[in-house]
Amino acid sequence: MQAIALPEEICWLLEDAEDFLAEGLQNENLSPGAQDQRDHILRGFQQIKSRYCWDFQPQGDDLGQDGSDENLSGTHGPALASDASFWSDYQEEGIDDIIRGAQELDNVIKQGYLEKKSKDHSFFGSEWQKRWCVISRGLFLYYANEKSKQPKGTFLIKGYNVRMAPHLRKDSKKDSCFELTSQDRRSYEFTAFSPAEARDWVDQISFLLKDLSSLTIPFEEEEEEEEEDKEQEEMYNDIDGFDSARSGSQGRAMALPEPLDKEEDVYEVLPDEDDLEEDACGAHRRRVDYADYYQGLWDCHGDQPDELSFQRGDLIRILSKEYNMYGWWVGELNSIIGIVPKDYLTTAFEMEGR
């Protein structure tokens, strides 16, 4: 649906009204009735925006509007066609389930206060404005504060590149800056409260971008069916060979081996000494290949049945790196086997040269 074109003055008036309700009355001591009416009107704003495709901006894909940060001339426009598949995943949930209050979001990967660079700031306004920022479900949302009921802006992280950006500032905070850039969408610049915090934001967004680009692993059903057919064919060949041997015996009784007159020695085949280690109690046990063990860098919750969930610090045994080109390995944790994102793991043991 194309956005309905409104006169610029009406757009400004609606923006001012919404901003006053959302932020101007945020900390006011309202009666319960007035508070309910305020929330009701704000929900109406969101529903109207969703119905008429307002605030889905071609530059930045913002949902919601930070009046001091964005250019009002680009406020209203149709959603990008390239992101239609993403928004279709949330059609049943509705816009209210996507745009929630800062404390109502789920699947939060990273959140905290950042300074966001305003696209167009007033003469008296600051170029950098403090915002409560949250990464959730593939979205980057920024709020006026951590108790805000709706974001001042939202954009899709997929399709962006993230990097440290010390060139954004020339003061003492230059090493705490980072930016998200895209070829066909607007850029976003942020300043954290320390260089380490900025690097953590960059790392979290980088891993999320890799995860979004490799959500599915190609699965060739035809190859699996061919392997099953081949196994069945081999089984049938074995049975046919057994039947032909029986038919060639002309129905003779099978000759059983005669019992041994004297008992023969029975020897147990033991593994090589190189494959054994001796523990403190003197008992032998099979050697552990420490190179197969990796440690979780972050918490990872599997969204699919074949994905292995683990927490930071968990020791995971890697069974296969068959899907390495897609960014996934096959691992085992507590006797549970599943695929794990390799970028979430690090080697657990340092191997010394022998």
Swiss-Prot record:
**InterPro entries with a match to the protein in the record:** PH-like_dom_sf (IPR011993), PH_domain (IPR001849), SH3-like_dom_sf (IPR036028), SH3_domain (IPR001452), SKAP1_SH3 (IPR035765), SKAP_fam (IPR037781)
| Principal location | cytoplasm
Pfam families (alphabetical): PH, SH3_1
Q: Domain SH3, which positions?
A: 289-350
Q: Where is this region: Interaction with FYB1?
A: 285-290
- Example GO molecular function: protein-containing complex binding
- Keyword Lipoprotein belongs to the record: no
What positions are modified (Phosphotyrosine)?
Y142, Y236, Y267, Y290
Q: Which biological process terms from the Gene Ontology are attached to this UniProt entry?
A: adaptive immune response; positive regulation of adaptive immune response; positive regulation of cell adhesion; positive regulation of cell-cell adhesion mediated by integrin; positive regulation of cell-matrix adhesion; positive regulation of DNA-templated transcription; positive regulation of heterotypic cell-cell adhesion; positive regulation of integrin activation
What's one GO-annotated cellular component? T cell receptor complex
Keywords, A to Z, come to: Adaptive immunity, Cell membrane, Cytoplasm, Immunity, Membrane, Nucleus, Phosphoprotein, SH3 domain
Post-translational modification remark? Phosphorylated on tyrosines. Phosphorylation by FYN on Tyr-267 is required for GRB2 interaction. Phosphorylation by FYN on Tyr-290 abolishes interaction with FYB1. Tyr-236 is dephosphorylated by PTPRC.
Record localization: Cytoplasm; Nucleus; Cell membrane
Free-text tissue specificity from the UniProt record: Expressed in mast cells (at protein level).
Top-level division of the source organism's lineage: Eukaryota
Statement: the UniProt record of this protein carries the keyword Transferase: no
Location of the PH domain: 107-210
Name the SUPFAM superfamilies on file.
PH domain-like, SH3-domain
Q: What does this protein do?
A: Positively regulates T-cell receptor signaling by enhancing the MAP kinase pathway. Required for optimal conjugation between T-cells and antigen-presenting cells by promoting the clustering of integrin ITGAL on the surface of T-cells. May be involved in high affinity immunoglobulin epsilon receptor signaling in mast cells.
Free-text comment about domains: The SH3 domain interacts with FYB1.
Subunit structure, per the record?
Homodimer. Interacts with FYN. Interacts with PTPRC. Interacts with GRB2 when phosphorylated on Tyr-267. Interacts with FYB1, which is required for SKAP2 protein stability. Part of a complex consisting of SKAP1, FYB1 and CLNK. Interacts with RASGRP1. Interacts with FYB2.
Which family does the record assign?
Belongs to the SKAP family.
* PANTHER family recorded: SRC KINASE-ASSOCIATED PHOSPHOPROTEIN 1, SRC-ASSOCIATED ADAPTOR PROTEIN
Protein name per its UniProtKB record:
Src kinase-associated phosphoprotein 1
Write the gene name. Skap1
